[in-house]
Amino acid sequence: MSSFQRLNIVRKTGFVAGVATLAMIAVSFSGGPLVAASCRTDAMAGIDWRECNKRLLMLGGSNLDSAMLYGTDFTYTDLRGSSLKGANLEKAKLIRTALGEANLQGANLTKVEAYRSDFSAADATNAKFVNAEMQRTKFENTKLDGTDFTKAELGRADFEGATLNGSKFSLTNLSRARFGGAKLGGPVDFTSAFLLLTRIEGVDLSAATGLDQKQIDIACGDAKTKLPNGLTAPASWPCPEDPDDD
């Protein structure tokens, strides 16, 4: 073999190796197999499970603090008692997900899909549920101090017994949601919230902000409901029970 032929082989080998390297880099940036490999990694603090399929799993008690869970699918998954402090769950799917007694302090749940999920007795202090889809979701006895539900869809959500100090429900759909026994010890913002048949029987709303008479007129309270100064109970109170309350 001549020196010229050997030189051509070296050049071709180097070119192929370079192409392979570039292909690996392209795959990693495009979210291909290199990124997908992290989906098989066990739960741990700071894990990157973005857009992974985590449906129908038993992950109760997991430590997912500060985890990257953007777009992750947790449909029907059990995350009860798990810690997700500071986790990024933006656009995650939490449909019928069990999150009872989970720690979600400071977590980002912006634009999550969480129909019929259960956050009962969880701690979601200072969490963000902005623009979230959470119809019929349970927040019974949940800590929601400083939690932001701005523009969220919370029709028929259950906030019975929840702690809501300084929470935000601005522009939120709360139609037929239930707040019986909820504790609103701080200024809760209901500016432009939709309160059609929202159950506020016995709730102390005296420190709430952003409420107007039109909102109160379509809500459901009773003689024990405390309203902010200047607002009065409509003659339609109390409302009959909702036949579709399940």
Regions found by a protein language model. Give the residues of each.
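Bacterial N-terminal signal peptides that target proteins for export
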Residues: 3-20
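Absolute N-terminal positional cue centered near the fourth residue
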Residues: 4-5, 27, 137
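Tandem repeat scaffolds
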Residues: 30-246
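Hydrophobic core
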Residues: 20-29
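Exposed boundary/loop context
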Residues: 7, 11, 24-25, 39, ...
